[in-house]
Amino acid sequence: MPKMKTNRAAAKRFKVTAKGGIKSANAYTSHRFHGKTKKQRRNLRGTRMMNETTIKTYHELLQK
């Protein structure tokens, strides 16, 4: 049976942590900041951890 291919779109967007979690950049950060509060903009910086219910699906896409 051939090896499963990694979904390249997912591999470019998500990183698997050492403990098996998945982190990604926040959405809603490319434009239209004038409509967001200072608190919203501050909280959108950096990365976020994916919730437990969707991690299994994304591990299948990433083959990890």
Swiss-Prot record:
Keywords: Ribonucleoprotein, Ribosomal protein. This is Large ribosomal subunit protein bL35. The keyword Nucleotidyltransferase does not apply. One of its GO terms (cellular component) is cytosolic large ribosomal subunit. Disulfide bonds: none annotated. Pfam families: Ribosomal_L35p (PF01632). PROSITE patterns: RIBOSOMAL_L35. The keyword Magnesium does not apply. NCBIfam families: rpmI_bact.
